[in-house]
Amino acid sequence: MDAQSTKDQGPEGADAGTLSFTYHIGDMFEDAPENCLLIHACNSQGHWGAGIAKAFKQKYPKAYTAHNKFCAKEHSKTQPVPTGSAQLLAPVDSGSQHWIGCLFTSAKYGKAKDKPDAIVKNTTASMSMLLELVRMADGEVSEIRMCKINSGKFGVPWEKTEEALKSIILQEGWREKIEIWEP
């Protein structure tokens, strides 16, 4: 099935220095071009066990191993990965040339996940950091795709996350266009 897309329905006269979204229906992994960045929100414990994170773990097992090592081995329980930060994983899985972007929007998962307002606040800082990491990758990333982050297992209405993301003021060299995918 071909993915369907619609243009951003943001407010008229929106600042040119903010993120621009196009919306797509379909599988964000399917037919993703080489060097595409695929973004999801995750906890800072390195656990990809449910929701779209589980799909990332199944499709990109070597990326998951690197992510888990970063969270669980390179950071101690007393010095965990800070929420509001991000990780950019270069392509490591054979047969896949996709970058993985991890937005650390909640410290924990399940019933212990952060409150929605904290997750939304962490999202702006996480995305800002990820956009800077992409800039530092110096043109290696072809395009950016993202699910409706936080709206699944973290239970945050997409509209709140979307508003927070659109409040980010882009810095020089940051990507502006992001494709938003939903099944």
Curated annotation (Swiss-Prot):
Q: Please name the Gene3D superfamilies in this protein's record.
A: Leucine Aminopeptidase, subunit E, domain 1 (3.40.220.10)
Record keyword Cytoplasm present: no
Q: What is its EC number?
A: 3.1.3.84
Question: Looking at the UniProt record for this protein, which Gene Ontology cellular component terms does it annotate, in alphabetical order?
Answer: nucleoplasm
Q: Name one GO molecular function term.
A: phosphoprotein phosphatase activity
- Its top-level enzyme class, in one word, is hydrolase
Reactions catalysed according to its record: ADP-alpha-D-ribose 1''-phosphate + H2O = ADP-D-ribose + phosphate
Please give the Pfam families that the UniProt record associates with this protein.
Macro
Superkingdom of this protein's organism: Eukaryota
Q: Which CDD domains match?
A: Macro_Poa1p-like (cd02901)
Per the UniProt entry, what are the Gene Ontology biological process annotations, in alphabetical order? DNA damage response; purine nucleoside metabolic process
Q: Which residues bind substrate?
A: 26-28, 41-43, 48-53, 149-155
Protein name (record): ADP-ribose 1''-phosphate phosphatase
What organism is this sequence from?
A: Phaeosphaeria nodorum (strain SN15 / ATCC MYA-4574 / FGSC 10173) (Glume blotch fungus)
- Gene name, per UniProt, is POA1
